[in-house]
């Protein structure tokens, strides 16, 4: 039986195994508090995320279960990886992951990025997305603050709690407005992996310019700013709008022509602009795929088709339409955690037999 110790962080009780010491708060999200800690077993610095009251409602239980399943399934150098998970005696859930020193939002607000860093960060974002999308997962909430970076400029995508299945009937409001794809605002139902490419394009533009590309105050203003730069959506995109109110709004807007991005980004590398043009396309069907973008000339210093893996198997979304009581989600979560530790111990044993740590 693991020994648990308690610590107060920002008035919140952290009840963690004695394996983790030196807790320091590093961030607060809508669903949990994140602390840095030292892993006494490995000597490494880690991030410990406490999920607040995961069993308080069926919705929160399902969301936590989804995040746990995704963290277990997604194994890629540019995606945050799970190193431990446990349920405390108070029945809070703790995810332990790698700790990276900063995130892209903090970097972008501190100083302009040089060209080689922009290229390398974009390459890693797209490399991670190629893998995630091949697993049948859409992140849906990609933004600078959930792209983590360490001192070696290694980059990892995190916060998969909102991620959803690639599903032709996806539901509305999710990602932070500045990075939200137009099809989420316009159709509210049918969208897919292309929403992440739009978000990555907005992040790319922000790295080039040093400020958000589409800083909308609300949905209407957001859409207006997008059309100022990219022009009015084509008719075949407008025809996919499901909501009559949204359709009337879009049809009432004055016609605008797409502006050449080179006029907006006067100091940027022409190859960067060409790739950005392929990412920021109104019609998601014509937006560049992650794998295609990796092969773009702008990313040629880093592109290696032999080292841009796809997922070995699709993520199992069979639970996602389930409407279950909290107690059932709790049993399923316990089962996943037991499975995680069994797999982990088997791997550790194998490593020791082969002379590993």
From Swiss-Prot:
Active site feature: 141 (proton acceptor)
One GO term describing the cellular component: cytoplasm
GO molecular function annotations of the record: ATP binding; MAP kinase activity; protein serine kinase activity
Reactions catalysed, as given in the entry: L-seryl-[protein] + ATP = O-phospho-L-seryl-[protein] + ADP + H(+); L-threonyl-[protein] + ATP = O-phospho-L-threonyl-[protein] + ADP + H(+)
Residues the record lists as binding ATP: 26-34, 49
Keyword list, A-Z: Activator, ATP-binding, Cytoplasm, Kinase, Nucleotide-binding, Nucleus, Phosphoprotein, Serine/threonine-protein kinase, Transcription, Transcription regulation, Transferase
Residues carrying Phosphothreonine: 171
Reported modifications of this chain: Dually phosphorylated on Thr-171 and Tyr-173, which activates the enzyme.
The keyword Phosphoprotein is assigned to this record: yes
Residue numbers bearing the Phosphotyrosine modification: 173
CDD domains: STKc_Sty1_Hog1
Domain Protein kinase: 20-299
Cofactor: Mg(2+)
Transmembrane segments: none
Enzyme class: transferase
UniProt-listed Enzyme Commission number(s): 2.7.11.24
Taxonomic superkingdom: Eukaryota
Function per UniProt: Proline-directed serine/threonine-protein kinase involved in a signal transduction pathway that is activated by changes in the osmolarity of the extracellular environment. Controls osmotic regulation of transcription of target genes.
PANTHER family according to UniProt: MITOGEN-ACTIVATED PROTEIN KINASE (PTHR24055)
Similarity annotation: Belongs to the protein kinase superfamily. Ser/Thr protein kinase family. MAP kinase subfamily. HOG1 sub-subfamily.
Stated name of the protein: Mitogen-activated protein kinase Hog1
Organism expressing this protein natively: Zymoseptoria tritici (strain CBS 115943 / IPO323)
